[in-house]
Amino acid sequence: MPYLRDFSLLFWYNESTKTKAVFPMMTQNADKKREQIQMFCMDDLVPQDHLLRLIDQAIDWSFIYDLVIDKYSADNGRPSMDPVMLIKIPFIQYLYGIRSMRQTVKEIEVNVAYRWFLGLEMMDKVPHFSTFGKNYTRRFKDTDLFEQIFSRILQECYKYRLIDPSEVFVDATHVKARANSKKMRKRIADEEALFFEEQLKKEINEDREAHGKKPLKEKKEDPKDPPSCGGSSDGKEEKTVKESTTDPESGWFRKGEHKNVFAYSVQTACDKNGWILGYSVNPGNQHDSRTFISLYDKIKDIGIQTLVADAGYKTPAIAKLLLDDGITPLLPYKRPMTQDGFFKKAEYVYDEYFDCYVCPNDQVLAYHTTNRSGYREYKSCGIVCEGCPYLKQCTESRDHVKVVTRHIWEPYMEKCEDIRHTIGMKEVYAQRKETVERLFGTAKENHGFRYTQMIGKARMEMKVGLTFACMNLKKLAKMIARRGKRGTSKCLLLIKYTLFAPKTRKTLLAC
């Protein structure tokens, strides 16, 4: 007797009697409940442990009204859309990594949790996808609204004492711009002045006068001078740059050996527990050492003791800036750029007392001058070097003169090297991969941070501010939810016990 299968039933068929027995396997009732009319509460449809519910409980969103009150008219015009809802819509987009505002609105239409979070009923019409864009252009453009939202959420994290700013980790990542790499033009652009330009010029002239040289006159930088720490010291220098015709504010960035794209550089600072403390947005073709000051100005007053950064920030200017402000810079070893087969700069020993260098053949390189980039030049005697057995490993100059440069702020770099070799600093630097680099990975993997659909630096700053705000708030909401019915003090003690080192744990338990 054969078995016959249907979509929902298993049949046993008797060929002799032409009968069959039915064995129910599954129930088909998909179409029976579509036309039902039910009464329910929106709040009951959202699980108690849903992320949006936790976020809504973690912060009072009414602070947005105070931030936008001056953007709305009080005595004329028709009623506007609720500003809190207006901000929550892109917040949902960046929280869940939805690719566009149009897709976000489609998701809100069918997602009960999204509607509950926005305060919409099941039959309420969802705002048009262009509503936020129009409000941004007419109300929020050229304002710091989104940075204030980020700061307000960060204050909540400080209120719960979850942030430890003693060790701050700084790094930058690139976000691909919405620009075709084939649609570009070349233009002549002025090099931006460095943040230390005036101070460097003053100290260069003081150094020259101390060596019996005349102060430098105001003129364009000599192209033969070596580059200063992070770039040219003359803000008027011109250079040819590639500019996107789609997004002129983005920068041409070398993503790999064979791939170039237009992108934005996002510099970020976080503490050792992964809380984002600040950010800055710049074109992708600007070096991290040049744009560091824009981020540093935002975080320098939060109580930093040690600032950890990669080799891109290891310049004399940044080392001096941090040490003068009482901050310990933890910067890694930087491989020398010396050509293969030649002596490295470290093999030339500097004599601080006589202010000279001694080469591997025990010959003196005496002080010659201080150039416009802030480097002292030490030169050897060509007649002595002509018969040196190490000449081919030292220089290829026609006059057999070896030139070694030393920045006037080199003592600050030497101090950084001493800090790097201090016991325990190697372990602190290794935390970069667990803090700031992990943040970039999370943002790109879960929050749509690999590329941007926004055009322009201002819109990109809005995206970065809301993305980092939602990452901090997501983390805060989950930690508050773990507290449950326990008191605030016990929860904070548990959090500190989990996050801090074993030695600190004993102190906390003794309290």
What name fits each language-model region?
Residues 3, 10-13, 18-21, 496-499:
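Short, positively charged and aromatic/hydrophobic N-terminal segments
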Residues 8, 90, 97-110, 120-511:
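Anion-binding and metal-coordination hotspots
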Residues 14-53:
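Hydrophobic alpha-helical membrane-insertion signals
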Residues 24, 73-77, 424-427:
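A ubiquitous short alpha-helical element
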Residues 28-32, 78-80, 122:
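A short, ordered amphipathic alpha-helix with a cationic face
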Residues 35, 48, 61, 82, ...:
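Generic alpha-helical segment signature
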Residues 48-91, 96-97, 408:
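Basic, short loop/linker segments at the boundary and entry of helix-turn-helix/winged-helix-like folds
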Residues 115-119:
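Short arginine-rich
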